[in-house]
Design a protein with these regions (language model features):
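Short beta-strand segments at enzyme active-site cores
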Residues: 84-88, 120-123, 151-153, 279-283
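Acidic/histidine-rich helix-loop elements
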Residues: 59-63, 91-99, 214-216
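Active-site acidic/histidine proton-transfer and metal-coordination neighborhood
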Residues: 14-25, 46, 106, 112-207, ...
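Active-site mouth loops of central-metabolism enzymes
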Residues: 55-67, 123-133
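Histidine-acidic metal/acid-base catalytic patches
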Residues: 2-4, 8-25, 33-58, 65-82, ...
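Charged helix-capping and loop-helix junction motifs
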Residues: 99-107, 135-138, 162-166, 219-227, ...
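Glycine-rich, proline-tolerant flexible connector loops at the mouths of alpha/beta enzymes
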Residues: 85-108
Length: 311
């Protein structure tokens, strides 16, 4: 599909993809648990590879000139993805096109993604659990309307663990939607042993394996192998962010998949062996090569994942 295709013609024809790869929005990682474990992009999702479902966070498309909801749908299909972690800003822009925020537009937004065979498993609202209760209720309403079972936000500062943890727990419990914490390089293998996740079973981890690798030092009391980290916290992990970073000793660089220190090639057979149904979301953060763009690079990352998963 050409990126020069008009948005109108793309959306009009997107129902053709629905019969091939429509993902049910109900339940956690539905495709991972119901599709054949030997499937490669068939059945529930076009990016379900031998039991591991690959998507991307739509932050990956931030460098594209056009990045509203219609564009995001087109990019996901072109990249061969059947599921997304959708940035909240994309939803907000869609709902405000008439001026005031119109919640009545949410069914049409969901239908547009569903018709293209692209599910939304997470909505990213980095500020959820803050002081704005009205906005938090809106964010929960968005997630439920779009079929997402989780909202992600950043890991708070240690001094805010209790405040943010309790607020997020109350929201997650009230609405039946997970809230998962996304890490940068501030966590170690002990972070989630503390109180942050203890306020509710609905508080989860969005594990960024690349950022974790970039934080690793020689302190064996604070850092363990990233696959051992997943083993330790597998009951609390909802999704994994995929990027290939080098360790701190190697400059903590963001590199193309397969060129850094992050064990992405080992990750897929590891998850397949364990049978853990985590969404694995590409997050494009390395420098885009000259002559390429974010859509082409996400496709490159997806091809890497597909191969690593044995497809």
């Amino acid at each position: 599909m050409s990126l020069n295709m008009t948005r109108r013609s793309f959306i009009a024809g997107s129902t053709a993809f629905g019969g091939l790869a429509l993902v049910s929005a109900a339940g956690m990682c539905t495709g991972c648990t119901t599709a054949s474990p030997s499937g490669c992009g068939k059945g529930k999702s076009r990016s379900l590879y031998n039991g591991v479902e690959v998507g991307c966070i739509t932050y990956s498309y931030r460098s594209m000139r056009q990045k509203n909801a219609e564009d995001i749908v087109q990019y996901a299909v072109e990249d061969g993805l059947g599921t997304l972690e959708l940035k909240g800003e994309v939803v907000d822009e869609y709902l405000k096109r008439g001026g005031a925020r119109d919640m009545g537009r949410l069914p049409a937004l969901r239908k547009m993604f569903d018709d293209a065979g692209v599910s939304i498993h997470i909505v990213k609202y980095g500020g959820i659990g803050g002081r704005n209760e009205k906005e938090d209720e809106y964010r929960m309403a968005v997630a439920k309307a779009l079929g997402a079972k989780c909202i992600t936000r950043e890991v708070p500062k240690a001094a805010e663990y209790e405040t943010i943890g309790r607020r997020c727990a109350a929201l997650a419990d009230k609405h039946g939607v997970y809230i998962a914490f996304h890490n940068h390089t501030q966590i170690d293998a002990l972070t989630y042993d503390g109180p942050l996740l203890g306020y509710s079973p609905n508080l989860r981890i969005n594990f960024d394996i690349g950022h974790y690798v970039a934080a690793i030092t020689d302190d064996a009391t604070r850092f363990i192998d990233p696959l051992a980290f997943i083993e330790k916290y597998h009951e609390k992990i909802y999704s994994i962010h995929l990027k290939d970073r080098t360790t701190k000793a190697h400059g903590a660089k963001n590199l193309q998949f397969g060129k850094g220190d992050t064990p992405l090639e080992k990750l897929f057979p590891f998850l397949q062996k364990k049978g853990w149904p985590f969404y694995c979301d590409i997050e494009l953060e390395y420098a885009i090569p000259k002559g390429s763009n974010a859509v082409k690079e996400v496709a490159r990352c997806n091809a890497f994942c597909r191969k690593a998963a044995g497809c």
